[in-house]
Swiss-Prot record:
Entries under PANTHER family matching the protein: OS08G0516900 PROTEIN (PTHR33172), PROTEIN OXIDATIVE STRESS 3 LIKE 3 (PTHR33172:SF96)
Protein name (record): Protein OXIDATIVE STRESS 3 LIKE 3
Major site of localization recorded for this protein: nucleus
Keyword field contains Lyase: no
Lineage: Eukaryota, Viridiplantae, Streptophyta, Embryophyta, Tracheophyta
Origin species: Arabidopsis thaliana (Mouse-ear cress)
Amino acid sequence: MHYQEQMESLMLGEERRRGNYTRDVDADADEGVNSPSSFPNSPDDSDRRSSSSSSRRGLSKHYKGKSQSFTTLAEALTVEDLAKPENPFNAKLKQRRESPHCRRLSGCGGASERNLSVHDVFLAGNDRPPRLSGNRPPPRAQTLSAAHISALLTRT
C-alpha cells in the first residue's frame, strides 16, 4: 500500500468518526478507489474490532476519546476554548503561597523570611535553631560570652 492511500484512508476514517463524511461511495467505486474499510489496518477496521471484542486491555478500557490537553482549531468557538483548563490542585497551591498567613508564620518560605536573631531564639526559650526549608545548611552557632548571657538573663 502506498503512503498516499494510507493517508487517504486515515483522513476518511477521521471524517467518518466526526460525522463529516460526505463522499459518495458509488463515486469512489467509479474512480477505482478502494473503500477505507477494505484496508486491513484502517481506523474503521480497528473501530469494528474494538467494539466487537469485549476484552480490552490496559488503559484502553478506561480511556475513550482524545486527550483533553489539546483542542482542535475547528472545534474552538472562542479564544477561551483554546486555553488549557487550570488544575485545581495548582490553583490551591498558588493561593496558599500568596496568603498573608503563610508569610506571617513563614510556614511556606522558611526561616529566612522571619529574620530571627540569636537573641530572639534564646529569649523565646527555644534552644533549637529555627527550621530551614530547602537544602540550605543550618545557621552557624554563635558562642555567647558569660557576660552576654548574664546580661540577657537579668533583662528577663
